[in-house]
C-alpha cells in the first residue's frame, strides 16, 4: 500500500478538553473527569501538518469532540476560529471547503454560545437520548441528577436563534420499549436530523444493554416502527441509518472501504497533541495487543513519517486483514465497507476480525428493514 491509498483527510477530530460535565454510564472515555485542555498554540502546528502532507483533499471538517467542548469558554473557539481562517486561507482560495463542527450535550448552551456558533459558523451536533426518563437513566451529572432538562433548554436556545442542529441518540435497552414515543419525541421537539448510536461494548464501557439475539430482533422492530411513523407523517425526520442506505440503493453505489478503515481519511488529535487515524474511538487508548493506538505527537512527528512507524504498520496490517475478511464473508460489505476497528477490537480483541454486534445494529438490521419496506410498499423513500 502506498500513499495514494491513504486519505484524503475529510474529518479532523480535535479533543478541545478531556473534561465532561456529565458522567454518562455508557461513555467509553476513561479520563472524562480530568481537565486537560488543548493548547491553541498547537493548532497552527496541527493545520500545518495536514497541509504539508499529501493527504489533504477538497473538504475538511474540523470536529471539536471527546469530552464536553463547551466546558471551555466561547473565547477558546473565537481564537481557534481565527487561527483556522488564517491558516487555511490559501487552501480556501484553492477551493478547499473548511467547516467547523462541535458535538455537545447542550447543557451549557445559552445566548452567548449561540452567538459564538453563528459568528464562527460552527455546525452544532447535540446528544439527546429521547424522553426524560430514558435520557436521564444514563446521561447524568456526577451528583446523580439527570441532564435532560438542561439539554432541552439548550436545544430550545439553538432553535430560538435559528441554528440548525443534528442530533445523536444513544439507544439502550430502555429505548426499545416504545418506538412510537421515541419517534414522537424527536418529531415534536423539532429535531429533524437524527442518527442512532446503539450502545456499544467499547473502552471503559465493558458491556452493553443491547447485546444478544433478542435485542437484535427488538431493534429490528424498533426501526420498522420508526420508519412507519416517519412515513405516515411525510418523513419529517431524516434518519442517518436509512438515509445512507437509501442513497446507495437508489444510486446503485457500494462501498469498497470506509473512512474508519482507510488510513488518513480521519485524523484524530487529543488534548496533548497526540494523533492517530482510523477510528477516532481508538485515540489514546492503551491495549495489551497494540499498546497505544497513537502514532506520534504533532509537535515532533509528521503524518507521512508516522506511516513508517511500527505501530502504524501493525494497525494497517490488521485493519486491512479485517476489512478483507468482511469483504470475503459478509453479504452486507457494500453497505459498510468493512466495519470499524474500535468495535472489532473491543468485541474480538483484534482489528483482524470481521462481523461484530455493532455492525449488525448499524448496517445489517437497517438494510433488512429498508428492504422489507421497499418490498412491501414499493420504493417510497424520503
Write out the residue ranges for each language-model feature.
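Exposed loop/turn and edge beta-strand positions of beta-sandwich/beta-sheet ligand-binding modules
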Residues: 10, 58-63, 96, 263, ...
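Radical SAM enzyme [4Fe-4S]-AdoMet core and its adjacent flexible, acidic
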Residues: 141-149, 156-268, 272-275, 280-298
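Cysteine-centered iron-sulfur cluster-binding motifs in ferredoxin-type domains/subunits
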Residues: 16-23, 71, 325-329, 333-334
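Radical SAM/AdoMet-radical enzyme domain recognition
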Residues: 47-63, 72-201, 205-212
Amino acid at each position: 500500500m502506498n500513499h495514494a491509498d491513504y486519505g484524503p483527510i475529510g474529518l479532523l477530530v480535535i479533543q478541545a478538553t478531556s473534561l465532561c460535565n456529565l458522567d454518562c454510564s455508557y461513555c467509553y472515555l476513561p479520563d472524562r473527569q480530568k481537565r486537560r485542555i488543548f493548547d491553541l498554540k498547537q493548532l497552527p502546528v496541527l493545520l500545518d501538518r495536514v497541509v504539508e502532507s499529501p493527504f489533504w483533499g477538497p473538504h475538511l471538517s474540523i470536529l471539536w469532540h471527546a469530552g464536553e467542548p463547551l466546558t471551555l469558554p466561547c473565547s477558546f473557539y473565537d481564537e481557534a476560529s481565527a487561527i483556522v481562517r488564517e491558516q487555511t486561507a490559501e487552501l480556501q482560495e484553492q477551493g478547499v471547503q473548511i467547516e467547523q463542527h462541535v458535538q455537545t450535550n447542550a447543557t451549557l448552551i445559552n445566548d452567548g454560545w449561540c452567538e459564538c456558533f453563528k459568528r464562527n459558523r460552527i455546525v452544532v451536533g447535540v446528544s439527546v437520548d429521547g424522553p426524560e426518563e430514558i435520557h436521564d437513566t444514563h446521561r447524568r451529572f456526577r451528583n446523580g441528577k439527570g441532564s435532560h432538562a438542561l439539554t432541552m433548554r439548550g436545544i430550545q436556545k439553538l432553535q430560538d436563534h435559528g441554528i440548525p442542529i443534528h442530533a445523536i441518540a444513544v439507544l439502550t435497552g430502555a429505548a426499545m420499549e416504545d418506538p412510537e414515543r421515541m419517534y414522537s419525541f424527536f418529531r415534536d421537539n423539532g429535531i429533524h436530523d437524527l442518527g442512532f448510536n446503539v450502545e456499544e461494548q467499547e473502552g471503559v464501557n465493558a458491556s452493553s444493554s443491547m447485546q444478544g439475539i433478542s435485542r437484535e430482533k427488538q431493534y429490528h422492530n424498533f426501526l420498522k416502527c420508526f420508519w412507519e411513523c416517519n412515513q405516515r407523517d411525510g418523513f419529517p425526520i431524516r434518519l442517518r441509518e436509512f438515509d445512507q442506505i437509501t442513497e446507495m440503493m437508489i444510486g446503485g453505489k457500494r462501498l469498497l472501504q470506509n473512512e474508519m478503515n482507510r488510513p488518513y481519511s480521519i485524523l484524530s488529535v487529543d488534548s496533548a497533541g497526540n494523533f492517530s487515524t482510523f477510528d477516532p474511538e481508538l485515540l489514546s487508548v492503551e491495549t495489551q495487543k497494540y499498546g497505544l493506538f497513537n502514532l506520534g505527537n504533532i509537535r515532533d512527528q509528521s503524518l507521512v513519517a508516522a506511516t513508517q512507524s511500527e505501530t502504524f504498520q501493525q494497525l494497517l496490517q490488521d485493519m486491512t486483514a479485517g476489512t478483507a475478511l468482511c469483504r470475503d464473508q459478509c453479504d452486507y460489505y457494500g453497505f459498510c465497507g468493512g466495519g470499524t476497528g474500535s468495535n472489532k477490537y473491543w468485541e474480538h480483541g483484534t482489528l483482524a476480525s470481521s462481523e461484530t454486534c455493532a455492525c449488525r445494529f448499524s448496517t445489517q438490521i437497517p438494510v433488512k428493514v429498508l428492504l422489507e419496506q421497499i418490498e412491501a410498499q414499493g420504493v417510497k423513500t424520503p
